Structures are given as structure tokens and as C-alpha cells.
From Swiss-Prot:
GO terms for molecular function: DNA binding; DNA-directed RNA polymerase activity; zinc ion binding. Binds 1 Zn(2+) ion per subunit. Keywords: Chloroplast, DNA-directed RNA polymerase, Metal-binding, Nucleotidyltransferase, Plastid, Transcription, Transferase, Zinc. It is found in: Plastid, Chloroplast. The keyword NAD does not apply. It comes from Manihot esculenta. This is DNA-directed RNA polymerase subunit beta''. DNA-dependent RNA polymerase catalyzes the transcription of DNA into RNA using the four ribonucleoside triphosphates as substrates. Belongs to the RNA polymerase beta' chain family. RpoC2 subfamily. Its cofactor is Zn(2+). The gene is rpoC2.
Amino acid sequence: MEVLMAERANLVFHNKAIDGTAIKRLISRLIDHFGMAYTSHILDQVKTLGFQQATATSISLGIDDLLTIPSKGWLVQDAEQQSLILEKHYHYGNVHAVEKLRQSIEIWYATSEYLRQEMNLNFRMTEPFNPVHIMSFSGARGNTSQVHQLVGMRGLMSDPQGQMIDLPIQSNLREGLSLTEYIISCYGARKGVVDTAVRTSDAGYLTRRLVEVVQHIVVRRTDCGTARGISVSPRNGMMPERIFIQTFIGRVLADNIYMGLRCIAIRNQDIGIGLANRFITFRTQTISIRTPFTCRSTSWICRLCYGRSPTHGDLVELGEAVGIIAGQSIGEPGTQLTLRTFHTGGVFTGGTAEHVRAPSNGKIKFNEDLVHPIRTRHGHPAFLCYIDLYVTIKSQDIIHNVTIPPKSFLLVQNDQYVESEQVIAEIRAGAYTLNFKEKVRKHIYSDSEGEMHWSTDVYHAPEFTYSNVHLLPKTSHLWILSGSSCRSSIVPFSLHKDQDQMNVHSLSVKRRYISSPSVNNDQVKHKFFSSDFSGKKESGIPDYSELNRSICTGHCNLIYSTILYKNSDLLAKRRRNKFIIPFQSIQEREKELMTQSAISIEIPINGIFRRNSVFAYFDDPQYRKKSSGITKYGAIGVHSIVKKEDLIEYRGVKEFKPKYQTKVDRFFFIPEEVYILPESSSLMVRNNSIIGVDTQIALNTRSRVGGLVRVERKKKKMELKIFSGDIHFPGETDKISRHSDILIPPGTVKTNSKESKKVKNWIYIQRITPTKKKYFVLVRPVIIYEIANGINLETLFPQDLLQEKDNLKLRVVNYILYGTGKPIRGISDTSIQLVRTCLVLNWDQDKKSSSIEEARAAFVEISTNGLIRDFLRINLVKFHISYIGRKRNDPSGSEPISNNGSDRTNINPFYPIYSKTRVQQSLKQNQGTISTLLNINKECQSLIILSSSNCFQMDPFNDVKHHNVIKESIKRDPIIPIRNSLGPLGTALQIANFYLFYHLNLITHNQISVTKYSKLYNLKQTFQVLKYYLMDENGRIVNPDPCSNSVLNPFNLNWYFLHHNYCESFFTIISLGQFICENLCMAKNGPHLKSGQVIIVHIDSVVIRSAKPYLATPGATVHGHYGEILYEGNTLVTFIYEKSRSGDITQGLPKVEQVLEVRSIDSISINLEKRVEGWNECITRILGIPWGFLIGTELTIVQSRISLVNKIQKVYRSQGVQIHNRHIEIIVRQITSKVLVSEDGMSNVFSPGELIGLLRAERTGRALEEAICYGAILLGITRASLNTQSFISEASFQETTRVLAKAALRGRIDWLKGLKENVVLGGMIPVGTGFKGLVQGSRQHKNIPLKTKKKNLFEGEFRDRDILFHHRELFDSCISKNLYDTSEQSFIGFNDS
């Protein structure tokens, strides 16, 4: 007792707080001194003491203890101000979305961090014993980050994927959150709850895979005799002492350690805490230690390479299953990685760059030759310096020198005046932050619809040569030129051409769907469209453009053209007087069937149409039937329209059928099957018998439907009809059945003696009397056809915008081609057309134009740009016009000169249609200019309507001197109605001449006129340039491919024109097609407000089509073609950028898994690949080819192993989980132990592409005395599990059938060396006690001598087995330069004795 007391008296009294590390050290020293039992007793006392003190202190937390920080208000305000400026820059197109996101994250992150520092200071000054303050630094639960959320601001949140939400939460939990902030907060909170569940299962699966990889690794030998080691230096200070000691303790030395001449530790000695501390104190040379990496065995490990057992502190026992222990040691904390998510609750943590600030006010000077301009990652202009840059700041008499380190950004210009503490440079964060970075793709979507346009050359990525993915070689803007578009695939042709002024009413349509009445096809069919003309007589306002369902075509040419679809086999057929246009229905287009229907235009041979003559017809496929039957249209009167003039008109047209015009809305079709058989054929069914489907009727005929059979014998043939339907035997009281051949509408009650029921559909009742006088009634189904009024052929012929006289009208009439009650026969498989839709020509007969009696029509063929188009021209003819002046070859002469005197030539651009278009519909109720755009995507082109809301006119040639009253009023209200001004797009009067003029000179004159405008020479007002193109800033003109239409709409009243004199105030030279950014100063009167493209240059004003710029930096991928039409929400650009991952827990487990499964290269920094390439070149240059392979592979493997261990350790350490390196090393050794055979020099042993173990490859090379070419490969843990020596182990992991089948085919042998194979087969597992028997069996094979004939390939040059270590200098230099991310380096170099 006295001895103990005396010892106590000698003990030193430590007065300092004990944290977790100190407790650990204390416990280990206690165990060393007193042993286990006594230590546990002491620890119990310590625990009791702790609980007593905590009870006595009784820290409680009240809401009053949460003190908010006074400076928060202005800090947040400042950050908001910065964000606002940033938003403006983005809007102007100065920064792109990624730069904006990055900067806004950094602004808020910095604010939040600053608040956090303020919080600590604030507490220390105001209330150092505040319980919140005490708790946050106690190290128990809660940390500054959480307290900061309570009293500072929550800041930026991560979403479930670890990405940033760029809307910060400005409130803290004490103040309370707004609704938006609450919802964003829920992301982080949700992660804590959900992850706990989900990630636990993930961690379990990770453990399973890890154990699978290493289950066969058992300690089987004491020493493998390796001479290699991994060298660790305690001197370089890169590693914290704690981690250094943790790396060392329990390892075995691979070499003697000398201190001067004195040996302080010998090879194969294990390192305890005393020795480790001695190494640190002496700062000895690099220490070479043995690790599982250096063990020479392939499928097991030796005691010395493994080191001490973690359980009892001695060298590991033979037969210990260290593989399984390693797998569980790494997998098990995975659950901890997950369960700790609630630490920061999803709050984002990242890093910001360091800044260099100016020491005082003054002018800054530096050498401009040493810097070159660059964009920072926030999109700001800056200078990058490659070497140390010396900057002088000169105030009145003091000169300050500042050195800026290399690779920094200089944020000021030369000779600029800087203020004290202004940020002048930004130091790039060092290489160690790379570990938290990853490559991310960010898609930018367009905010508005319009055409895409870019202002620089773009390249095709090699793998996307034929698609619409382009890579940008330099920074440039992408513009979306606005225009609202209409997308429709309903009607496949239109009659408008580029630049036409058109009345959009002619395209205004509604979609209507009518369900298909046919039984077998219940798809919804589109009715093409019913016109949306509303000007009926009831409205009382006669509007010529909305005449009731008629289309005025006046004197202008009505032009038709060939239509080409995406399937080019649908060509219009042209005969002498007939023109057939193929036409695809929706279903056909979806199924890509050949078209079945067409629109035919027939012209009388003499080319003259009279009034009411049929001009075109269309056979609608929905009125087409395969089966025979009878049409009925009720008792409503029917009259024929076949009159005399029609007979004259059809002179020479061969097929002429009577056509019946129905006044009814619907008609009925009663189907029946008809078979016409030769008289001699023998029937297999009786008359009036009832048969089922597919019954044999005659020799080669089977019935297609079931029903009642009626046979009629006629001259030389027999007619056999099958009526489907129900047979009904009427009672005496049944009155309905007395009638025959009647139609009964739905809802009529059909009575019977036994049952009475309502009829659901229309039925047809037919009375049938067989020979035995007993009659019965056949109830037959009826198909109803609703004839929709006016199928939309009329919408193909747009109304004329300008001509009001001599209106030519087209009436749509539906004819039923068969009379009521007449049987219709279908011959074999041809289908029967029941209804034909015709267009009947008509024109007004008012007083003025009473003389018009006929219209001339002709087909005209015009070849433009190598495309041949067929046009149809119709002109109304007055009798007093003579035809004498026609020239044969003159294209303009083939048409009579009409009354208004302007001779329109055939090249007149009114309503022609380019080939390859589809009919689009526009839903805008206004007029516009149509424009054809490039659109490679032929499937669904679109109309673009460029309405006045998308354009604005501004006047750059403003002079302050010329202000007058009107100018002032314009300033107050900039919208002047278009009617008061003859602006470039308001010139409806000049349109006739103008069209002719521009269309003949497509592009040539415009360039000249534009340059003249831009220099403002005296050109006349009438010289309008309305040709619309996509022109880029380099002055190239793109002539758009005529693949889609767009409508530029100039006639609304909200364009504004500012008219006054131009003078010398004109600064910017404006050229056509130029793009103008927002707030660009074009004239003295200040910046102009919107961004856009100049489409019209006037003498005193310009018209700008509004456009939105998007900035794109080099390496970005552009989706879409130049001039393609994009809709809102389409992907525009994809940026690939490096971004910091949030350091939150959620990243822990996936990160470990990503490293172990060797997933994508995203997480590898961009510089690393370059470093590896450089290293390879350097090696092969020094050593030559064969050595290069060997050493390259060897080093790559060593290097990747060290790097993987560091990465995994980093994740675990960041979570406070401590795992001994050797566990990770065992796993990593397994996933890096294979190489890939690269060339077939060894074809007699290994095939190229085969995976073999590294050691096996080396041994085979030595034995065969040949060099094997192989490269290192990293297998993920899953692949490594499926590439083992044992197929039983593989099959029990996953893909069982595949593994077993392959093993059977290859005749694989399983030597049952691992644990799992033996467990599966019920044998004794070769670990622990079962290990002894295994060893005894293998001893006898040990001493067989191996004889080699020749000297080894390697021995000639280097005697030692491991040649690479003779290149020690090369090795160290390369490694130190190239291969290391020196963050927390556990190992440096690579050593051999």
C-alpha cells in the first residue's frame, strides 16, 4: 500500500481537457502498466465520475439561449446584392449557367462561413457560459455547424444526390423558416431518415461483396521471404502524428533501421508504440515496412506481412481468416457512415479560394508579358500568371511589393487604382481539394421557343459526325431567335413559301377528333381540320377573309406543288390532266405504311372550268370498306348533280360515275359477305342455314364471317351472301317484325314473349321467309357513317390578303358514290369507296364581275434550285380579255393579264410550296410573314410565327438636337400605332412590287444595300430589305433549307417606331444580321433595352428580332443544328465541369463503393490522366520497350494500390471512423492483382485479353524465358469475385447458371482452397483447426527441385530478381514529381533491399 502511495506522489498532475484521442492513449498506457482487469476497474470509476459531474452541472437548453448574430442582416443583404448583379450578367449573356451557379454558391457559402466565425466571437464576448456555446465545443454531440444552423443561417442545402440547390436558406431555425425554405430544408432532413434505411442495406451488400473477394485469404505461413517493403517517412510532416502512429503500430519492419551507425531496429521486428514514438522523436530515415501488398504469395498471406492481430496485440496466428476480418472491418463501419447522417442535416459544405488583398491604396503595376488573359471559373475576365509575379502598388511615396504565386488569377488591370484591402488576386486552391471534385454534366434548357443560331464555328465530335451534337472550340454565344411556333403533324401540305405575307386566318384551325365508326379499328382518327372561320351571316359583320367556309383566291395564282414526305417514295404522280398528291393518315405515318389515299386534281382537257364544276376530289380512307354491303340514307330526298355542263366538262375523262350528293349528315352501311361462284361449283352449305366463321362453303372458299346463308342462282353464276346478325322469331303480338327492311334507331324496345330489351345500336331488320312459310326476322348490325361537313381541303388554298375583287371560292361537297338500297359488290380484295369529297369551284356573281363565266386552269412546271415543282394555276377569265399576246416560251405569258394590271410572273412567290414540307397549322389569329427555316428533323416540322411581340424596332440614329413634341410623347409612350407610319413592315401598299423585286434577286442585292444602309447613304425609302435570313456575325449568309415554315408577323399594332432625323450621333455601325446584346449603347440617347438580331435596317431606324443569348465555353456540347427550331424546355447546351462534392455523410458510402468497384473516371481529376501519360512516356524512353512494360505495370499497380488505400481511408477518417490500413490493403491487393494480356506473343500460354494474376504472369515469363506483354487492370470487387480460381465460389455469388455453364464447357477444376467452396460442399474449412491438415498435405510437394535449361532472360542484364530497384534515382524522381496527390500520404516511395 505504501508503495502505491509513494508512486502516486510521484505522478505528475495534468491540468488539461481530455478528448477522445487522449482517452485512447490513457487507456492503452493503463493496459501496458496494469493489465486488462485493473484497467477496466479504473475505467468504471472514470465513467461514474463523468456521470456525477454531468448531473451536477445540468446544462439545459432554453430558447432564450439561442442568441442571433447582430451582423447577420447586412451580411445577407450584401450577398443578395452580389447575387442580383450576377443574375444581370447572366441575363446579358456574360456568364453561363455553370459559372452563375458556381459563383452564387461561393457567395452564399462565404457569407454562411463568415456568420459562423462571427457566431463564435459573439458568444465569447457576450456569454461565454451560454449552454449552446459550451455544447458546440464539447466534442460530444452537436458541433459548430449545427449550432450555426440554430442561430446563424442554414445556408445552402444539398439535394438527395449531393448536388447544390442554389437557393440559400437565409433564416435560421431560431427565427423560423419561410414556406419555400421549409420545403428545401425537407430535402436535407429527409436524407437523414431515408438514408438510414436505404444505406444500411447498401452497407450490408458492400460487406457481402468485400467478403466474397477475400474469403480465401488465410494466414498460411510465417514468412514468405519477400525483400520488398513500402517506405514511409516520419520526417516530411505531410502526415499528422496520430495517423502516422496508427499506420505504424502492428506492422513488421522489412529492413534494419539505423540511426547513424547504430541499428535501432532489425528486419522482421514488429513495431509497438514505444518503437513508433522513438521513430518520431529521432526523425529517422525512411522506414521500410512490410504490408499485404509486398507478400509474395498469390492466394494467401504470411504472418510477417500481415503484422499484429488487432485482437490480442501479438503476431497473427497461422490459420487466421484475415480476409473475412478485413472485409467485415471495412463493410461494418459502412452502417456507421450512414447512420450519422443527421450530423449536418444536408447542409452543404465546400471550399472557397484564398485571396490576395492590396496592402494600401495606390496604382498597381506588373509586367504584362508574364500574364495572359483568361476567364475565371466565375466567368470574370482575369489574367493568369504562370510563374511568381511581382506586383508593385505605389501610393504617394510608399511602394509596396506583393508576390503572387504561380497559377493564380490576377483580377485587376495594369495601372489600375486599387483601394486598401481590395482583392487583387485569387490563389487557386491546391491540389488536395481535387479529391472532393467530380465531373458533372449540366444541361441548359432554352427558356423560349425559336430558332437556334450560333456565332462561331463548331466542330462535330468524332463519334457524332452525323448527328446534331457539336463541340464548341471557343467561347461564344448561342442565340435563340424568338418566334412562336406551331407544331402539327396533322395536315401534310401548305401553300406558303418563304417570306410570304399571309393572312394567318387561312391556317387557323382547330383539331377535332371523331371516333372511328368502323368496328375493327377503334383508334381515334383525326379529322384533318375543320376551319375556324367564324364570319357567319348571324354575326352581322361581313368579313371577306372569313366568308362562310370558302376560300378566296382572287387573281393571284393558286399554286400547288409536289409533296415529299420523309419517305420519298410518296411522289406525286402527274398525268396530262390529272394530278395526284399522295396523302398519309396519322396511323399510317405512325406505322410507316405506304399511303393508301391521295388527292386528285383533274383539269378538263380544254383547261376551262365552268361554275360549279368539280375541281379536286379526295377519297377519305375512313369511308373505305373491304366488305360488300348496302348503303341506306333514310327517306330524305336525294338529287343528282350530274348536269349537262358536267358532261361537257368531263368530255375525255374516261371514268364517269353518277355521283349523288347527300343532304343527310349520316348514312348507314349494312355489311354482308358476297361470294360469286361459277354455276358448276358444288356448295357445301344449304340455303337459309346458319354457319360459323371459317366454314367451308365451296371447294376453295371459306367464309370470313358467320351468319345466315342466302343463295341466289343467276345466269352462269351463283351468288352466295352471308348476313351476320341475330335471328329473331317474332310472337303474334310483335308488330315490329311485320315490317321488313327497316332501320331501327337505338332505344327502341324490342318485345318478345319472354324478354323485352332496348336496342343499343342502330339495327336493320330484314324479313326472311324460308320455304316452309314460317318466316323469321334477321336483325343485322349497321355501321353508321357521319359525314363531317367540309373535310378540310379548302384550307389548302389560303385566302388572298390583298385582292378583294373577283373572289374565287371553293365549296366542299361530299358525294356518296352509290345509291340508296343498291347492293355494293367488292371484287376479291379491292376496297370500296363509299364517299368521295369533292371541291367545287364557284365564284361570286355580283354586279361588277357578272361577265366572268369561266376560269382557266393549267399545270405549270417550274424548276428552281434543281428542284422541279408542279404548280396549278387558276385564273378567273373575263370575256373581254384577249389571249393573243401569249408567247409560247415566256414563263410569264402563260397566264392572262388580269384586271389590276400588275403582271404576276410564275416565279411569283404567292403560296407556292417548297418540296419536302408538311402542312403546318398556325393558331395565331393575325397576319404574318412566312419564313422557311432549316430543319433537318423531317419528322415534324413547324411553323414559326414571328409576331410583333418577338420583334421591336429601335432607332439607333438618335440626335438630341431634334427633340420635338412628338419625340417627348414617344418617350412617355413608346408605342405608336403602325398605321401612322410607313415603316418597313407596314408597307402593305408596296407589297406587290416589292415581292417581285426581292424574289428575283435573292441574296445579291441585299449585301450591297445593307452596307449602304449601314453607312447611311442616301437610299430611297422604297428600297426595302425584307429578305429574312440567318446571318452570323462573321457576315456569312446562311440560305435556309426549305424544310419548315415560319411566319414572321409584322402586322400587329405593337411594334414601335421612333421617327426623327438621324445625325452624327450614330456610333455603332449596324449591319443586317448583326446580334446586339442587351444594354448595348448604340446611340447617344442611352442603351437600347433588348437583345436581338437586326433584321431590317432602315434609313432612320432598325428593326430587331428579339433573341436570348446563352454563353457557352469551349468543350461544351451544343445540341441541335444551326437554324433548327427549338421549343421551350429543349436541351440547348451541355457543360461538363468539375465541381466540389458536398462533404456530407451521404457521400461516404457511395464514395467507398465507387472506389472499390472502380467505377467511372468522373472522380479522377483531369490533371491525373495527363500525369500518368507523361510518366509512361518517361519510363519507356529511359528503359526501352520490354522494361517499360514490366516496370510500367509494376509501378502502375503499386501506385494505384497506394492511391486507392488513401482514398478509402480519407472517406472513413472524414467520418471519424478508424480502420487499420492493412484491412483495406488486403481488399485492394485482390482487386489489383490481375493483369490483362495485351499482345499475342504468348499465344501458346495465354490468349490476348485474358485476365491472369500478376505473380503468375511474372513466373510464367521467367519459366518460359519470354517477355509477356501485359498491362495493369483494376477490377471492381464484383468483377474480382467473378474472376477467382474457384467456380463454386463465383457461382454462389451471382450469375450462377452462367458461371456453372462456362465452367462445365471449359472443364474447370476447383481445388477447394477457399472457405466458401468448402462451406458450400460441406467439407472442412481450411482455417483455424482445419488449417493443420491442409498444411500437412502440402508439405511433401515442397522440395521438388525445378531445373531450368537456360539462364533467365533477366539475369543477363540485372542479376537481382527485382530489376526495377537499380533505377532508384529515376524512380524517386518520377514518383515525387508525377504520381502523388500528397494530401494525407500514408506511403511514399517504394523500397527494396
